[in-house]
């Protein structure tokens, strides 16, 4: 599993741990919990230190429709966040988003695109966007979003 991408690790662990009528409660990779499930709803937990990701993060399209919460931890070296939450139509919660260090990020395009259940975001006013050169479609399709700090 060492050479697997993050999404391949999640898919592998989900398939490996299927039990109790296909109801998975969590997925652990390297003893770190990355996915929690409640019936058909996912909570994704990103931790760069454990995943070893250095340039971009991606969520597989076959699980985005069920993600309701994403928790971000220790993601400091990522440079490309484009499309990270794109099409997460049930997503409404982002614990840790305000603490996300995006100092090295150059691309935020379509980050929250079509996240139609987001109503407000945590305070992102302290984000350092000085290196970002692409923010196109950042909030495109977020029709319920009424508050950005």
Regions found by a protein language model. Give the residues of each.
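Negatively charged
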Residues: 1-149
